[in-house]
Curated annotation (Swiss-Prot):
It is found in: Cytoplasm. It comes from Bacillus mycoides (strain KBAB4). The keyword Iron does not apply. One of its GO terms (biological process) is cell division. This is Cell cycle protein GpsB. HAMAP family: GpsB (MF_02011). The keyword Phosphoprotein does not apply. Transmembrane segments: none annotated.
Length: 111
């Protein structure tokens, strides 16, 4: 990411010593060093701009999500209505029906 593009640290800049020539510092060495500083600043500036844009985009998306969440109608949660529990199974019902038939019709069914 950004650390791959940056060649200098604050320590490098602070500790940089230029060799002096007959009339002072060597112009080419100073120019090369300043070129490296300029490239680093350009990389920092570019990365900073990208991060600002990304931050703004993410803030917009967050606001859109908040607005969308407030616009969704809150539907009440429907709990399932408890059905009456019958302990009778089909076989129990058939047995009861058979007993009723015997009581009503008596032995006529079995003659």
């Amino acid at each position: 990411m950004i650390s791959d593009k940056i060649k200098l640290t604050a320590k490098d800049i602070l500790e940089k010593e230029f060799k002096t020539g007959m009339r002072g510092y060597q112009q080419e060495e100073v120019d090369k060093f300043l070129d490296m500083i300029i490239k680093d600043y350009e990389a920092f500036h570019k990365e900073f701009d990208q991060l600002k844009q990304q931050n703004a985009r993410l803030k917009r998306e967050l606001e859109e999500q908040k607005v969308a969440a407030t616009q969704v109608p809150q539907q009440p949660v429907q709990t399932p209505v408890a059905q009456p529990v019958y302990n009778n199974t089909n076989t129990d019902i058939l047995k009861r029906l058979s007993n009723l038939e015997k009581a009503v019709f008596g032995s006529k069914l079995y003659e």
